[in-house]
Amino acid sequence: MDREALLQAVKEARELAKPRNFTQSFEFIATLKEIDMRKPENRIKTEVVLPHGRGKEAKIAVIGTGDLAKQAEELGLTVIRKEEIEELGKNKRKLRKIAKAHDFFIAQADLMPLIGRYMGVILGPRGKMPKPVPANANIKPLVERLKKTVVINTRDKPYFQVLVGNEKMTDEQIVDNIEAVLNVVAKKYEKGLYHIKDAYVKLTMGPAVKVKKEKAKKK
């Protein structure tokens, strides 16, 4: 996908969006073609680390005890302790709110069976099962990576929509982030980006701007 076309779409999306009293996010939307999304192997569900970050940090919760919980507190993350796991399993409404409020979960590895039993029914279908780490792990590097990470998830639909930054970032930074997303899609399918039918860029409250396709070169 042509970089200049992406830059033009980002520029237009910025110009067409009315000013708001909050920082709007940039979103990238792509529709897919000639892919049978009924087949699980054709679906995309993967994480992408954006080179310039998400524009807003991912919200992360840590499920653990001792040193792991202490690290999470020092990093300003939500902490869910061992004794809360069963309680949350019995309070589905509260668990749903927690799942909705957080982008990623990290958990002490030896607590995963307990988490699966009591929290899996809510976290699993949402693609938010925790990333297991040893009880003595230094989670700061993982947290820093996750803060810049977005998830592409098509499920069984021939399209995806993903966060690629915010309006305070430059057009070049937004396009760098979009290209990081496109690189993942290109590696997923044998014909790469051929399978992208149309692509759009938009701000939170603005209209979607279609990315112009490259004109076929004359032979």
Swiss-Prot record:
Listed InterPro entries: Ribosomal_uL1, Ribosomal_uL1-like, Ribosomal_uL1/biogenesis, Ribosomal_uL1_3-a/b-sand, Ribosomal_uL1_arc, Ribosomal_uL1_CS
Gene3D superfamilies according to UniProt: 3.30.190.20, 3.40.50.790
Record's keyword annotation contains Repressor: yes
Pfam families (UniProt xref): Ribosomal_L1 (PF00687)
One GO cellular component term noted in the UniProt record for this chain: large ribosomal subunit
Keywords, sorted A to Z: Repressor, Ribonucleoprotein, Ribosomal protein, RNA-binding, rRNA-binding, Translation regulation, tRNA-binding
Highest taxon, organism lineage: Archaea
Keyword Lyase belongs to the record: no
Entry GO MF terms: rRNA binding; structural constituent of ribosome; tRNA binding
CDD domains noted in UniProt: Ribosomal_L1 (cd00403)
GO biological process, one term: translation
Coiled coil: none
PANTHER family from the UniProt entry: 54S RIBOSOMAL PROTEIN L1, MITOCHONDRIAL (PTHR36427), LARGE RIBOSOMAL SUBUNIT PROTEIN UL1M (PTHR36427:SF3)
Purpose: Probably involved in E site tRNA release. Binds directly to 23S rRNA. Protein L1 is also a translational repressor protein, it controls the translation of its operon by binding to its mRNA.
HAMAP family given in the database record: Ribosomal_uL1_A
Subunit details: Part of the 50S ribosomal subunit.
Family membership noted in the UniProt record: Belongs to the universal ribosomal protein uL1 family.
Protein name as annotated: Large ribosomal subunit protein uL1
Species per Swiss-Prot/TrEMBL record: Methanocaldococcus jannaschii (strain ATCC 43067 / DSM 2661 / JAL-1 / JCM 10045 / NBRC 100440) (Methanococcus jannaschii)
Gene behind this protein: rpl1
